[in-house]
């Protein structure tokens, strides 16, 4: 956590200099974050920043869209919740004038369950939930393949969709949900592919994953401003 706090303070300073906060020194720097366990470290970083003279206000969101909208329209100075592939996809889709200014923590997307303690316990026909945005859909399907549950077309990468599934020997049933509600669906599905910070809010221990991706370096969370 200390590393996150130090990185957070450095990034807050960078956002203040490079982002909208530099132009409105009489107002607090407004930072959009997603509701989740990781905000504990962010709240500490904000307190430390305030002690050093930088006024920061955290604004929590429960969805994936509003934070980028807020930074783009100027109601937020920055946000801290997304990895680079997701940011790039939103810029392409929405035309946002957003830029990543600092690297945050790396969070491994993983398979979680409230009903089963191991992948081997998943029954045939198990219901699996994951985020429905294109980038995280592809990411989730790659993790399901890495875990040995499905097979995808060769070299499909993060653009994978259900149409790219070539083998599903356990006849898994897939539920594509808005990203912020996937964790809450854990009571209704056999497992979900989601980030640790979101499952913590749903009362699941982040370390209890049935399977976590092996390499998550490309999916480090970024500080984003305009």
What residues fall within each predicted segment?
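Ligand-binding "clamshell"
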Residues: 89-101, 115-116, 188, 193, ...
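Short helix-initiation/N-cap motifs at beta->coil->alpha
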Residues: 58-69, 156-184
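Beta->alpha turn/N-cap motifs
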Residues: 36, 60-64, 74-88, 105, ...
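Short, polar/charged alpha-helical segment
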Residues: 35-57
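Bacterial N-terminal signal peptides that target proteins for export
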Residues: 1-10
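Periplasmic-binding protein-like
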Residues: 103-112, 200-226
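Immediate post-signal peptide segment of exported/extracytoplasmic ligand-binding proteins
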Residues: 21-30, 49-54, 119-125
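A conserved helix-loop-strand patch within extracytoplasmic ligand-binding domains
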Residues: 101-151
């Amino acid at each position: 956590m200390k590393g996150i706090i130090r990185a957070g303070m450095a990034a807050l300073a960078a956002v203040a200099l490079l982002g909208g906060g530099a132009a409105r020194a009489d107002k607090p720097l407004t930072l959009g974050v997603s509701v989740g366990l990781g905000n504990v470290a962010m709240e500490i970083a904000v307190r430390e920043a305030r002690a050093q003279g930088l006024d920061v206000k955290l604004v929590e969101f429960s969805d994936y869209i509003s934070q980028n909208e807020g930074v783009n329209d100027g109601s937020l100075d920055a946000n801290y919740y997304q990895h680079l592939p997701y940011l790039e996809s939103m810029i392409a889709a929405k035309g946002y004038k957003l830029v990543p200014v600092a690297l945050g923590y790396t969070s491994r997307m993983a398979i979680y369950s409230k009903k089963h303690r191991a992948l081997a316990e998943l029954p045939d026909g198990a219901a699996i939930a994951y985020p429905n945005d294109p980038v995280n859909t592809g990411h989730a399907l790659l993790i399901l393949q890495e875990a040995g549950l499905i097979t995808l077309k060769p070299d499909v990468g993060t653009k994978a969709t259900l149409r790219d599934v070539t083998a599903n020997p356990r006849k898994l049933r897939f539920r594509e949900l808005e990203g912020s509600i996937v964790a809450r669906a854990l009571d209704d599905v056999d497992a979900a592919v989601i980030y640790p910070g979101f499952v913590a809010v749903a009362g699941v221990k982040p370390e209890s994953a049935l399977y976590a991706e092996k390499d998550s370096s490309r999916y480090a969370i970024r500080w984003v401003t305009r």
